[in-house]
Swiss-Prot record:
GO CC terms: membrane
Residues binding UDP-alpha-D-glucuronate: 393, 398, 432-433, 460, 492, 526-535, 613
Protein name per Swiss-Prot or TrEMBL: Bifunctional polymyxin resistance protein ArnA
Species assigned in the record: Salmonella choleraesuis (strain SC-B67)
Gene, per the UniProt record: arnA
EC nos: 2.1.2.13, 1.1.1.305
Amino acid sequence: MKAVIFAYHDMGCQGVQAVLDAGYEIAAIFTHADNPAENTFFGSVSRLAAGLGIPVYAPDNVNHPIWVDRIAELAPDIIFSFYYRNLLSEEILHLAPAGAFNLHGSLLPAYRGRAPLNWVLVNGESETGVTLHRMVKRADAGEIVASQRVAIAQDDVALTLHHKLCQAARQLLNSILPTMKCGDIPSVPQRESDATYYGRRRPEDGLIDWHKPVSTVHNLVRAVAAPWPGAFSYNGSQKFTIWSSRICPDAQGVLPGSVISVSPLRVACADGALEIITGQAGDGITVQGSQLAQTLGLVAGARLNRPPATSGKRRIRVLILGVNGFIGNHLTERLLNEENYEVYGMDIGSNAISRFLLHPRFHFVEGDISIHSEWIEYHVKKCDVVLPLVAIATPIEYTRNPLRVFELDFEENLRIIRYCVKYRKRVVFPSTSEVYGMCTDASFDEDKSNLIVGPVNKPRWIYSVSKQLLDRVIWAYGEKEGLRFTLFRPFNWMGPRLDSLSAARIGSSRAITQLILNLVEGTPIKLIDGGQQKRCFTDIRDGIEALFRIIVNEGDRCDGKIINIGNPDNEASIQELATLLLDSFDKHPLRCHFPPFAGFQVVASRSYYGKGYQDVAHRKPSIDNARRCLGWEPSIAMRDTVEETLDFFLRSVDVAERAS
């Protein structure tokens, strides 16, 4: 039986080895590239696969149609997921006739979701386990194939329980995989009434509340002990981490957070005292409790506290879905530059936002909006402003995958809009300049211009009409149910991190990235239909400043408004853009590392995009609404934008790749 495996971490290594031992043929393994910001104390699936001579891949988005097609070509009989961190699309789950199966680190249906290992310790459970279950669209909700219980000892911490679960997983897989290979796959439906769901844990969740019962504080220490980030508290402004502790007898009449003694180091909780056995001050070394007290300058009677507040006013919480995208990562940077904003984000990757992952006001979860509905609903309820930025927005995908464009761009985003209506949250929705379609106005006005698209047999319009329909639904919710909204329409924003050269290689990128790839690889620049189509190119910095002002919404002037964000002065044809780009390329200091210019090549849009494509001659915005509502005016010249975008991509090319 041929298997394709998705795996990561120690559990991934155990799963791969168990599948091999059971006599399966492994066609390929999909894993993750290690994150430099993460403590990778665990085994490497990629090294294991390489040593076994098995093809291994680590795509940023395994659910992209390109990868779905490649997995389909492998023709797997069965699919396994062992601690792979991204949920798999239904397209992938349906590729294997025998089904797709996931190993989860709890006794389902309890502790669905993220970090069950840590959550069971936080909650003081005495038992957990591992479960192999059939994969369905909803996370961890499929029929149970087999499970194995694991007792949690009172002295277990996260790492010891992790090792127990790995052993239990191997025993479970050794027992059930041969049976499954013969076609005998047990299936027991989960009882939804018993289901519990837990989200991802973040380092800041380790902050100790000394007003909690001592058992609760001790369990938190156990749950996040090394190599996890640790439970922590503050002595004044000095942070310290507790790595191990024990529960002591009652501390009657002592205020929670008070130091009872320094040798041993004991701190009062709500109903007892926590003895700190080992700990660490700041970024120092791990020491015993009494030495930690000395390092911190603690004396009996001192009070430990929460971190000092920077302001008495609660920060504005902004939820960005698609935070790793072009607009999302630049907007995050702008918001975090202001002290009064906190950003919550979800995306299927984190390469563009890696620079924010350790920021105390940035909270990120890696996930898919089509799957993590519980997390999204919770955070819509929690946050003040919601920006659903997830969309397929590259023209070649409109003709290649029109149904997927509709499902993601309309159906999934409609669900998020309905959450905003339900919890009465403000939504700032990214419409698109594409909604104007083949409008004949000299400049497109948000409130007056007609929205004109082509015939049904031209699927390139699926993106435009999906966005337009959502615009109309949002408007109706505002009129009929009081939804607070602003629609913004970007006009050809450009800048660093627009997309990637690897996306351009498979044709799934914006125009300028494709042109830069041609220059980098020494291939002809393709001018679709001669490149005479005109667009108004807008610098990402100008665009983000306008979007930031929409979020600020001074005087509520943006409520119920549609706002074009573009630079009418930066109008140019694609051919003019290519010529300007070539001129900047020839002057760049890295020019000598790349091949000679291969010339321009005129290509028919039908041959490039497919028969379902139809282009637009011009697209120029009226920005009167932006001027009136935002006091905004774009200021960055197109040449500056082109040069900065080009520089970013050229410096991202590996030196060895340049030389080749």
